[in-house]
C-alpha cells in the first residue's frame, strides 16, 4: 500500500495521520503526530482464525512509553524499559474501554493493539494521540469494527469555561480533568476527576467533548477511504433459535425463579445446577446436537434476556429492590487498634476494609515519568482477593483491574485532601475488598473517606461514591441505583459517581451500546446525587468530619525554619551531624534548600528531642544571657568555653574572678562545667564571656 497522509485541525492543534510507511505487516498501522511534538505509532493485528472456545472477546491493548521519546535514558540497572508502569496500565485500559463494545457480537478473533510513544514534548499527555491512532488503525485495518471513535480531554476554569485538550500547565489551574471517547452519535467512555463540580457542569463537559471530537471522526473516515483497504469478509454466527427455544421452554421459568434468590452464592449455586441440567439434557456429540460450549452460551443468553426484560418491565430487581434504593449500609470506624485510621464499609454484599497510614515526606512514591522524576505524596491501593467472591484464584501483584479501580477511588477522594504545604505527611490508603457483589470501587471511596477522617487527616469534606446501571430495550429503559455484579454484567452501562454534598469529584462511565441520550445521562447523574447524599448522611452519623487530632499511632511532625547559612551546620561534615541526631532520637529530619525543616518522630518525645538538638545547633549566642558551658581549652590568657554546639567563647583571664589570678589552671580545669555570661559577639562571630559577672547578672534577674 502506498503511504497515505491526512492532516486536520483539532482545536488549537494540527494532527497528522500517516499509514503505509511504518509497520506495514500489521493489519493496520498509523503514525499520529500532533503539532510536530507528540508522535505515537499505533498498530493493530487480528488473528485470521476465530477462537470460539475463549468465552470472551480476546482483545488486548498495550500502551507503552519509550524514554527516548523524551530524550531520556531509563533508570535502574538494566537501562531499558521494563514492566508496564501504572500510567501505562491505566492508559491501556483507557484505550480498551471505548473500542471493546464496538467489535461486533460473535467476533472472536484475537485482536492486539499496541500504542508506542515515540516522541513527546512533555507538555501534554500522549493518551489522546494514542486513542486517535487506535481508532484510525482499526479503521484502515479492515477488521470488523463499528467505529471510528474520537477522543478528547476537557478542562474547566470558572472564567474561561471548558478547555479542549489542555496542557499539563493548564490542568494545574483547571477544576476538571476529563477524557471522553465515543462515536459520531454516542458517548462510550468518560474518565474524570473534578473539584466539586455540579452534575450540570460535568454533563456539559461530556457534551462539549463529544461535539469537539467530531472533527477527529470525520478526518478518520476520510483517511480510511483514501487507503482503499477492503473490509474483512466476516459474517456473524447465526443464532441457534431452536436451541434457545428449547432452553426457554424447559428451563426458562426456573431461570427466572433463580433470579429472585437474593443471596448471591445461593443464586449462583441454583444457576449452576440449572446450567448442568441444561447441558445434560441438550448437549451431545451426535450429529446435529449442540456442543457443551454452545449450550452454555445459549443458557447465558437466556439469563441475559430474562434479567433485562424483568427490569424494563418494572419488576423488582434481583435482590428485591426498586430502581432507586441503595442496599443496606453498615459503617464502622476505628476497627483496627494499631493502625492510624481504619473503616469497615458494608453495602449489601459488598464490603471494604480500608486502612489509612501516615508517613514522612521520605515515604512519598518516586515516579519516573516521561516528563521527569516527581514525587507522589498520596497513594490509594485496591486489593481484590479471590475469597471476596467465594472463589480460589491467583494471588500476587496487582492486576490491571485492581490498578484501575484503585485509581478511580483515588480520584474520588484526592480533591478533598489538604495541600502538602499545610499537611506535609505522605498518605497511603489501602482498600481490602473482603466481599464483592457490585461496585467495590465506590465502596473503596466511602471507606477511604472514613479511614482518612478516622486518622485525623483534615479532609475538606466527606466523600461517597455510587455505581449506577442502565438497561435499555428499544425505547424503554431503566436507570438502576447501586448495581449488583449481575446487573453490571448484564446491563448496558456502568456509571460511577463520587463526590461530596457540594459536587462531583470523580465520574467514570462505560457504555456498551449506542443510543444513550443526554436525557438518560442526566437522569443517571441526578439519581446518583440522590444516592450519594443518602450515603453521606449515613456516614455522617458515624463520623461527620475529621478527628480534631491525628491518631496517637501516627508519627508526630514538627516544622521549623532556620537561616540558610545554618543548613550546613545541621547537616555536618558528610552528613555526620544530622545522622547522629536521627540515630540518637529515632526521628527523621527533612531539610529544604530554603531552610524549612520537617521533623518526624514515632512519638512526640522523639520529635521534640530532635527539634531541641537542631535548635541548639542553630542557636546564636545572645549578649547578656547566661549559659552553662564546658571548659574546652585553657591558654595563658584565659579559657575557651563551649556554650552551644560548635560555638566556643573566650573567658579572658581578667574575666574569671574579681581577684587577681596568676595562672588560669589554678582556677579552671579542662572539662569543668561553669556558668558564663555573654559580654559581646563581634562581627566575625567571636564571643566574649565572663565568669565573674554571672553573680551580678543573676541578681539583676537575667
Swiss-Prot record:
One GO process term, biological-process aspect: mRNA catabolic process
Sorted UniProt keywords: Cytoplasm, Magnesium, Metal-binding, Nucleotidyltransferase, RNA-binding, Transferase
Residues reported in the UniProt entry to bind Mg(2+): 488, 494
SUPFAM superfamilies: Eukaryotic type KH-domain (KH-domain type I), Nucleic acid-binding proteins, Polynucleotide phosphorylase/guanosine pentaphosphate synthase (PNPase/GPSI), domain 3, Ribonuclease PH domain 2-like, Ribosomal protein S5 domain 2-like
Cellular compartment(s): Cytoplasm
One family name in Pfam for this protein: PNPase
All residue ranges annotated as the KH domain in the record: 555-614
Subunit comment: Component of the RNA degradosome, which is a multiprotein complex involved in RNA processing and mRNA degradation.
Protein name, as recorded: Polyribonucleotide nucleotidyltransferase
Gene label: pnp
